[in-house]
């Protein structure tokens, strides 16, 4: 897969940098560890990084509309994340910031590094381990929750508000004419 992707991207642009890790296959916990690591973000070039998982699609050519934000991803459904994913220090019921699905997300590299140097991605900082740890056996929380919630908790950069995030990407809830989607078919149910 690496050789195929590397050759394809080389033919598209010399500005695309493919980084190969020494993993044959990764699970959710490994993926979250990689993306939550300083090493990963230091290997990347540029100010803005588009995370594009293979189950994502880009529908429109309007990414410029979102460059002012340091983190933007599809909005989450509050009931899906409320008691499991929210940091202890913030009352999200009072805020319109349930944003951050990472499968298709645009991020400022420096802000990701600032989060990593400010707070560790451990269960003690989040509620996730109260009920889901026995089911998932995750050692750390999902990287998208770690970054977007930590940015808000520690005032690092600007996380896009929900009304902007829904124009950027869809996943569980349908919004008209987004930039793209991550597992967007979930919104068709």
Q: Where do the PLM segments sit?
A:
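Short beta-strand-to-loop acidic/aromatic patch adjacent to the donor-nucleotide binding site
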Residues: 46-58
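Conserved beta-strand scaffold positions in the cores of enzyme catalytic domains, especially
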Residues: 18-20, 71, 158
């Amino acid at each position: 897969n690496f050789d195929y992707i590397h050759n394809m991207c080389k033919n598209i642009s010399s500005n695309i940098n493919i980084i190969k890790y020494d993993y044959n296959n990764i699970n959710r916990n490994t993926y979250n560890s990689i993306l939550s690591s300083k090493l990963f973000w230091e290997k990347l070039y540029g100010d803005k990084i588009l995370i594009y998982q293979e189950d994502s699609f880009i529908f429109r050519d309007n990414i410029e509309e979102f460059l002012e934000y340091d983190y933007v991803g599809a909005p989450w459904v509050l009931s899906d994340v409320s008691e499991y994913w929210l940091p202890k220090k913030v009352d999200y019921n009072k805020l319109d910031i349930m944003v951050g699905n990472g499968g298709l997300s645009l991020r400022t590299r420096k802000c990701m590094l600032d989060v990593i140097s400010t707070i560790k991605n451990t269960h003690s900082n989040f509620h996730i381990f109260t009920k889901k740890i026995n089911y998932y056996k995750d050692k750390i929380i999902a990287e998208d929750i770690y970054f977007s919630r930590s940015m808000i908790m520690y005032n690092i950069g600007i996380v896009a508000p929900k009304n902007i995030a829904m124009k950027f990407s869809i996943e569980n809830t349908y919004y008209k004419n987004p930039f793209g989607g991550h597992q967007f078919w979930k919104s068709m149910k």
